[in-house]
Amino acid sequence: IDALLSWGIIQDNVGSIGCRLVFPDGSVQHAGQTVQIDEFNMLQCTHRGYKCRRKYKNEKVAGNTAALMMTRRDTFISNGGFDESYTECWEDIHLNMKYLLAGYSNWYLDDITAIHYESYTRTKSSEATYRLRYDYTYKLKPWFDQLSASDKQTVLSYN
């Protein structure tokens, strides 16, 4: 926590700061977020993790997971904080996109690692899956779709 905090203090114009999150077995769960438009013109928001083939480094990213993310309080508040109407997920991606559109940079720090127990704590019920899909379909995607072409390009340029 101190390393994330001290790094954020010395940087200007930071939206969020995140780090490498690994599962208890050591496999990478999170190494920054990506936001893409797929071949079906659908918004795809993913965590760079075990499927990511690029070399990890400290770099600007589309966003960071709120499982372990730092942001300045004034930046958080002035950008509306988390949208609490999300029921299962996606509010961190939404906030990170708002930071990019406001001119902030989101940073992933690869030299800092934490263990993330998401797979042990997130329910796998059909109800949770429904809430996840609902939040994406009726909250995040419509918000993204209404952005201007240049704002969409700003968000998509970090992949």
Roles of regions detected by a PLM:
Residues I1-D38:
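Conserved donor NDP-sugar-binding/catalytic core segment of glycosyltransferases
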Residues N58-K60, F82-Y86, Y120-A128:
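Active-site rim elements
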Residues V14, A66, T121:
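Active-site lining segments that contact anionic ligands and/or coordinate catalytic metals
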Residues V61-I115:
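Donor nucleotide-sugar recognition loop
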Residues V28, Q36-D74:
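A recurrent flexible, glycine/aromatic-enriched loop bordering the glycosyltransferase active site
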